[in-house]
Amino acid sequence: MILYPSVDDLLERVDSRYSLIMLASKRAHQLDEGQPELLDKYTSQKNVGKALEEVVAGDVIIDPNEKDL
């Protein structure tokens, strides 16, 4: 169960749960591939949790021009 960031906080950053899952999944894959972390400190040790923390911080957003999401 995810306690931080809360689902309510995350949904303030994206328009739907589907978009949130797709965004977090894509960012987690980027972290798996060695992309640099965007925050100085994370609560989570797992890449999916780190991706969600980046979303709630506003560092990861949906690009409306990208077709993969």
UniProtKB/Swiss-Prot annotation:
One of its GO terms (molecular function) is DNA-directed RNA polymerase activity. Its EC number is 2.7.7.6. It catalyses: RNA(n) + a ribonucleoside 5'-triphosphate = RNA(n+1) + diphosphate. Gene3D superfamilies: 3.90.940.10. This is DNA-directed RNA polymerase subunit omega. InterPro entries: DNA-dir_RNA_pol_omega, Pol_omega/Rpo6/RPB6, RPB6/omega-like_sf. The RNAP catalytic core consists of 2 alpha, 1 beta, 1 beta' and 1 omega subunit. When a sigma factor is associated with the core the holoenzyme is formed, which can initiate transcription. Disulfide bonds: none annotated. It comes from Pediococcus pentosaceus (strain ATCC 25745 / CCUG 21536 / LMG 10740 / 183-1w). The gene is rpoZ. SMART domains: RNA_pol_Rpb6. Keywords: DNA-directed RNA polymerase, Nucleotidyltransferase, Transcription, Transferase. Promotes RNA polymerase assembly. Latches the N- and C-terminal regions of the beta' subunit thereby facilitating its interaction with the beta and alpha subunits. GO terms for biological process: DNA-templated transcription. The keyword Glycoprotein does not apply. Belongs to the RNA polymerase subunit omega family. The keyword Transcription applies. It holds the Pfam family RNA_pol_Rpb6.
